[in-house]
Amino acid sequence: MSGKCPVMHGGNTSTGTSNKDWWPEGINLDILHQHDRKTNPMDPDFNYREEVKKLDVQALKNDLRQLMVDSQAWWPADWGSYVGMFARVAWHSAGSYRLADGRGGGGTGNQRFAPLNSWPDNVNTDKGRRLLWPIKKKYGNKISWADLMVLSGTIAYEVAGLKTYGFAFGREDIWHPEKDIYWGDEKEWLAPSDERYADVEKPDTMENPLAAVQMGLIYVNPEGVNGQPDPQKTAEQVRETFARMAMNDEETAALTAGGHTIGKCHGNGEAENLSAEPEAADVEYQGIGWMNTKGRGIGRDTVVSGIEGAWTKNPTQWDMGWFDMLFNHEWELKKSPAGAWQWEPVDIAEEDMPVDVEDPSIRRMPIMTDADMAMKVDPVYNEICRKFMDDPEYFSETFAKAWFKLTHRDLGPKARYIGPDVPADDLIWQDPIPAGSIAYCEEVVKQKIAESGLSIGEMVSTAWDSARTYRGSDMRGGANGARIRLAPQKTWPGNEPERLAKVLDVYERISAETGASIADVIVLGGSVGIERAAKAAGHDVHVPFLKGRGDATDEMTDAASFAPLEPLADGFRNWQKQDYVVKPEEMLLDRAQLMGLTGPEMTVLIGGMRVLGTNHGGTRHGVFTDREGQLTNDFFVNLTDMGNTWKPAGNNVYEIRDRETDAVKWTASRVDLVFGSNSLLRSYAEVYAQDDNEEKFVNDFVAAWTKVMNADRFDVA
């Protein structure tokens, strides 16, 4: 009898050749279709942000404090305290955030899923989540995994003795791994850093948007660049990686010192004796990975990074011990029992050593990683650390604020914060926006805009440019705040500064006359343009509008932190800043995903924008109509017309010719033609090209447009 499975493989439940295997160059529309009802086990009307308001916060915090000192035999706590473990669970949840695209971070509970649950840098965070499970089980729907993991780290620091800065609830769990996050191209864990740097000697040449030096790490290699100790080189990598998650040198030094004030590294054993990571573990392991298969593997015999030892004399207490240890001793390179490079003091009194995690009568050698040594060797970090040493209270305050920033950076603006411990202060990295007025007449504003002489293209383009900066990844950007009129946005090439200045001059005058914020006037301008274009095409529509946007000021805006929000391409306006290795249609998909659009929404917006005269610089690519300024489905009708042919005519330029006469009718970009060439996008385009769907096209365009304009309105229910 054949050894093959007797069951017919009717369902692709595990492996099989995928479309991506057959056609690796195809675009991945799956990134637009994530986190829907089919993967979410919660009831359709479940609203976590309302449910968490019912939480008994004090009871939860009390239970977490008890957990910190409730050592479990199956995974005993070091020195009887889990504070180091839960600080690490929270840190490694939040620490995957990167400023470049806002992706990663602790806002979704993604540490529960691959690849993060099985990253080499996340060894044994699975044990932390299992220790949290009884608490999650008890409080159920009132606390998300995302909130619980981050809160556990904050409570850990409080138990250790730190006065924390605050905490906000509001992180909503996802139910499958994100498909849109690019973690790197490497095919092996901890592949050499050279694979993601143009020049590993120049940290700023790391591939964007990455913010970790190797595949599977949160930040840097604790042993040194590519595992070779050199504190100054490591300092340069530390500076770059932390900058890529929006931390300055002082915040970086504080986080390094404070992060290593509690807990320890684990490397007292052989790494090769560990079982597979959670995602590869056999079913009997029940999602737990890295278990020691040849020894005890817990307590003092635990293996995580391979480095072995604590940084301070009192690893469960918040104090200045890290500074005392690092700056009051000379250090030499040693190998841990697991074979990892670590720094150990050349000469240290026994009473200054930390005790064994299980037996307080035994003293153990303290350690420093290469990243710790970087704080001493690098002159900038050294100066900051000495400032902290001279003022311990300032250090504690700086760390507490940096920890709050680390764990809340991807939660979005302060309007999204929930709970009794939300700090009163407005912090500049939260992109604060003042409340806007609602005491004005919307129709009066619209009438003034309509009589201003602005074209449909000018009105719609300005509203779009203001709103398109929104990123659902970290809830930054968007039309609220009208930051399009501030640096750096007002000079971005993608915003056509000359055209923008002309429109803003009109809108600022209307704002002053009516009491509406400039932000509201900008969005209303888009509404006026769309309603005018729809009427010209025979459709009487009203674009929904929400009053109350505010106008941010330069003082409220960290211009440098907004630089990563600059669009390098905008397929919706048929524009690229320059040629890139990445295809234009892939950049369109990325933009659409960050804006929270679905495939059909992206499609209908492209078709509508093309006929409204919104192309950047007035280019004619994709304007498949002789009725520009009317909201028609002509783009789709002519794109899908087999009476045409499509021929390359230069770099990212194509000609649409009459099939019989060969006369050029229109020109197009790759972004235009992908809606006819990609089978999925063509299926959407055909819907909007149908004779009976012109009204549907208009209604769907208005709905998608409104979604974009309101994406950042967290200030309203």
UniProtKB/Swiss-Prot annotation:
Pfam families: peroxidase
InterPro entries referenced in this protein's UniProt entry, alphabetically: Catalase_peroxidase, Haem_peroxidase, Haem_peroxidase_sf, Peroxidases_AS
Listed GO biological process terms: cellular response to hydrogen peroxide; hydrogen peroxide catabolic process
Active-site residues, Swiss-Prot/TrEMBL: 92
EC numbers for this chain: 1.11.1.21
GO molecular function: catalase activity; heme binding; metal ion binding
Cross-link named Tryptophyl-tyrosyl-methioninium (Trp-Tyr) (with M-245), sites: 91-219
Cross-link (Tryptophyl-tyrosyl-methioninium (Tyr-Met) (with W-91)): 219-245
Subunit: Homodimer or homotetramer.
UniProt-recorded name of the protein: Catalase-peroxidase
Name of the encoding gene: katG
